């Protein structure tokens, strides 16, 4: 075998870049799903929708760093904490926590589907 017959190819960086890209897309899709589920959770007892302001304020963002991708589901409505955690006179409606906890298997499946290709 001569040197001309021997070829080594390195695809490490390209492979890692592709995995990072897929992970970022997967987290974006999972974040959109979680945002939707959080809005739906407000319909569950104890239901507290008057104007829809809280529901309409729920959004998601993502943070992407090498090897670390995060979806953040949040609201900027000042009374959201009282609805979520409850008060002395009002039972909690943990719409954010429930949106995450009740759908973990779906989020996992979304992420796996993007990374398995």
Which residue ranges define each predicted feature?
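Short, Lys/Arg-rich flexible segments
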Residues: 1-117
């Amino acid at each position: 075998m001569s040197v001309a017959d021997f070829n080594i190819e390195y695809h490490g960086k390209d492979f890692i870049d592709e995995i990072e890209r897929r992970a970022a897309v997967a987290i974006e899709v999972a974040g959109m799903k979680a945002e939707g589920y959080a809005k739906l959770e407000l319909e569950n007892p104890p239901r507290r929708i008057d104007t829809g302001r809280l529901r309409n304020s729920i959004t998601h963002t993502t943070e992407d760093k090498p090897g670390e991708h995060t979806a953040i589901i949040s609201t900027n409505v000042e009374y959201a904490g009282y609805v979520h955690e409850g008060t002395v006179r009002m039972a909690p409606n943990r719409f954010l926590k429930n949106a995450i906890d009740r759908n973990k298997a779906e989020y996992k499946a979304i992420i796996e589907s993007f990374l398995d290709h």
